[in-house]
Amino acid sequence: MRTSSMMENQVSLSSIQRAVWDGKLPLQITLASSESRTYDQTDPYLIACPRISYLPSLLPRLRAFFSPSLIEPNSQPHEGWFSFEGVPLKWHLPVGLLYDLYAGADPASKGTRVDETDHPTSSLNDTLPWRLTVHFSDWPDEELVRLDADGMVMHDAFINSVKEADFLRNGTAKGIMTLSKEDSAGLWQAVQDVDLLSFQRISNILLPPPNQPFRNVPIRFFLPLSPDSGSPSLKVVQSPLPPNIPATTNTSQSTNLRHSPATQVQTLGSALHSLLPNLFPSRRTPVLAKPVLHGAAVPMSAPIEELVRSCAYGDGWVYIVIRMMG
């Protein structure tokens, strides 16, 4: 029975992962008016962009699309960068995370599709399509690392993030370090191509088997700060989070303590209560803020290891945006 239950759980996690990889965002990308021969009259570029992908992957086609309108005809695709309402967007963060951080509407609840391109609800109408601006000059060096023509800067940033996640899961980065050059390149290519089967073939080498728990769970929490805080607009909270924690004992129960479990599953609620107790005074119910992942509000009861196995981005991390309530 236990084996059957584990298999059913794996099927469920696999279906969630497929839904995550199928998720897309409609983007409306406009050339910066200062770089356009027609100022603000250039037609925008429209695309349904995979949530797990990265904005720089769009630069070659955007450079070709806007080529007739560019004042500077010699600009190169890798010189492109994106902004939203004047804010340069970090190119090393996935598209879905960037949207949830800067423009996300009220998160979808249980039962809502991950794909925002399908019949968006009224709560999404004001934010979709997500309107971005692409620039091919005036690179913001103080905020963004420059890209290169061969794409190695982007590749290396991705692989470094994979290494961090691998180290947290296993207590060592031996897995990613011993990947062949072909598999290392293939992992990044699978994310670019949104090829889940090719991705799973390689990423499963790095994951502990389902019956072996992670050492720690690679999760980062993003907290928005008020504009007048004098700090960057985002704060990232990260701490080693084991998938299991010491079990809490209910003294009112008359159970034999010798038969009580030594540990219990770490849920998202227990992790948030531990890291951010002022925002999450309850382990079970969102009171002041709610966690958002892939555009959806995440149940506080979700085991954090299962979140990573089913909902991680391509680099192995779960990126959760904390959205204030009310």
UniProtKB/Swiss-Prot annotation:
GO terms for cellular component: Atg12-Atg5-Atg16 complex; autophagosome; phagophore; phagophore assembly site membrane. There is a cross-link at K163 (Glycyl lysine isopeptide (Lys-Gly) (interchain with G-Cter in atg12)). Keywords: Autophagy, Isopeptide bond, Membrane, Protein transport, Transport, Ubl conjugation. It is found in: Preautophagosomal structure membrane. Conjugated with atg12. Belongs to the ATG5 family. This is Autophagy protein 5. It comes from Aspergillus fumigatus (strain ATCC MYA-4609 / CBS 101355 / FGSC A1100 / Af293) (Neosartorya fumigata).
